[in-house]
C-alpha cells in the first residue's frame, strides 16, 4: 500500500490534518509543540481510492531531551519508507529557519513532496504575504488548506492521489476486507514494556521506546500476517489512575482512547512489569477487559530479570489478585531480549479460537441438567430455582442463555459454578470470559 508521510516542524497542524484525512480524533491535538510523540498510522479512503498516512512526531530543529532526539532520529529513518511526503508549514506565520532546514532534508531525501500551507482561512492575506516565499522552497505550487475547518482538503486529496498514481501505485481498495482482521489491544500501566512488546511482535521500530513512563500517548496500529491470518495490533497509551488524569491534561485523551481500544479489540494483552508485580491498577485494567467480555492474555514482561522462584511467586500472586480472570493464559516474556514472543503468539491464536467457540446445544443441556441435579440452586424462601433450557446464543464472548422460572433466584456464586463446570467438562475456554444471560420462561 502507498504510504504518505506528514512532516513538518512542531505545531503547524500535522495531527489536525491527519485526523481530517482519516476521520476521527486519532492523534492527540494540543497547542504545545511536540504533543504528538508517536507515529500514528491511519488509512485514508476517498472516492474508491485508499492509501496509508503517517502522522510523524515532528522534525525537531534542536532536540531538547532524549525523547525529542530519538523522535528526530526515527522520523528521519522513516522518510526512506514513504512514497510521498506532505510538507506542512504554517500558512499564517510563513516560513521559519526550522522550515528551511526541514526543506533541505526533504530535498536530500529525493522523495516526492507536496507543500501544504495549513491554517489558511484568509486566502487573500495568504496570497499577498506568505505565498511568494513558499515558492522559494522549490516544491512547486503550494496547496493552501485549513485542516481545522476542512477547507481545500478535497483539492489536497486529488493532488495526493494523482501524484501516487502517476508514480505507479495502485490505490483501488475493497473495504469489506478491512473488518476481517483479528484485533488485539496491548494494554497496561505506563512503562510496563507495552511498546517494546509491540515492536518485538511486529518487527519494526514504529512505536517510540524509551525508559520514561508515558512516552506512548497515541494509539499506534500495525497489521501483520501470522500464518496467513491478518492480525491488527493496537499499541495504547499507558492507562493512568483516574485521580492522576486531569480533564484538561493531554494524557486524558490517551486514557479515553485506551478504553476505546479495549472496546474495539477482540483480545487484550495485559502487560505487567514482572519486576514490580501486580498492582491495584493492573487489577482495575483486567476488570475493564473482563466486564467488556474481551479475550485476555496476561504477560509478565521483563521476566529475564527474574529467577524461577520469583516466577512461581508471580503465578501465586496471579491466582490471588487476578482470580476473576483465572481463565487467562499467563506468558513470561522479555520484549527486549525477544524470548516468550513465540509462546505469546501461540496463546493468541488459541484464545482467538476460543472466543469463537460454540457449544452444541444438546451437550450444553446435558451438562446443565447433571449440574443442577448434583448442585441444585438454593432458591429463596419457599420458591425453588429451575433451569428449563440452555443454549449458546453468541460468541466474542461466548454467551449462554438460560431459560429459568425466575432470574432473581439465581445468585452470582451459582452462575460462577455453572461457568466452572462448563470449563472443566466441555472446554477450558482459555482466555475468554463466559457470559450467562437469564431469561424468564413465558
UniProtKB/Swiss-Prot annotation:
GTP 2 binds at residues 188-195, 235-239, 301-304. Residues 2-168, 182-356 form the EngA-type G domain. It comes from the Bacteria. Keywords: GTP-binding, Nucleotide-binding, Repeat, Ribosome biogenesis. Residues 357-442 form the KH-like domain. GO terms for biological process: ribosome biogenesis. GTP 1 binds at residues 8-15, 55-59, 118-121. The keyword GTP-binding applies. One of its GO terms (molecular function) is GTP binding. InterPro entries: G_ENGA, GTP-bd, GTPase_Der, KH_dom-like, KH_dom-like_a/b, P-loop_NTPase, Small_GTP-bd. HAMAP family: GTPase_Der. Associates with the 50S ribosomal subunit. GTPase that plays an essential role in the late steps of ribosome biogenesis. Belongs to the TRAFAC class TrmE-Era-EngA-EngB-Septin-like GTPase superfamily. EngA (Der) GTPase family. This is GTPase Der. The gene is der.
